[in-house]
A protein has these predicted regions:
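A short glycine-rich, Lys/Arg-flanked "PGG" loop and its adjoining helix->strand segment in the class I
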Residues: 2-17
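Conserved class I S-adenosyl-L-methionine
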Residues: 18-50
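Peripheral/terminal regions associated with large enzymatic or DNA-binding modules
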Residues: 8-11, 28, 89-91, 128-131
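Active-site rim elements
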Residues: 58-65, 122-124
Length: 141
């Protein structure tokens, strides 16, 4: 993450924003990512780094949650150029049904709006059900 944030800091002007849609840790996503996703998911990882064997190899699907939620104070200290403007947990079912893991969609296009409406009704419990989070970072320096 250090290389990514250093490069983003170099490229983004003050007031500029980064918009991220990242895997998120909830009771539901913990079950889904641990048992149905091919990449590692370790919310208890002690650090932000993990073993890798090369480009696009090695990962921790919980890393964004670790950085922006669990270790938020550390992020704010290490990257004072960035302010977390918004974290919005989302999509407990649409991501999965749209083929988010395998690219094979189980959700017909015509049903998207119905699923979105259904998920919006779940807002009071979204912190327990979301599989991803919409994250907005603003460069302040």
């Amino acid at each position: 993450p250090w290389s990514f944030f250093r490069e983003a800091t170099r490229c983004v002007v003050p007031g500029g924003k980064m918009f991220l849609m990242e895997p998120w840790v909830t009771a539901w996503s913990n079950l889904i990512y641990r048992h149905f996703h091919h990449e590692p998911f370790d919310p208890e990882a002690k650090d932000w780094e993990f073993e890798t064997t090369g480009p696009l190899a090695g990962a921790n699907q919980a890393l964004s949650w670790i950085i922006f939620s669990r270790d938020r104070e550390r992020f704010e200290k290490e990257f004072p150029e960035w302010r977390i403007e918004r974290i919005e947990p989302r999509m407990p079912f649409r991501y999965l049904l749209s083929g988010g893991f395998s690219f094979r969609s189980f959700m017909p296009g015509w049903s998207h709006e119905a699923w979105r409406t259904f998920e919006n009704c779940l807002q009071p419990v979204m912190n327990k059900l979301a599989t991803v989070a919409y994250i907005v970072l603003v460069k302040v320096k």
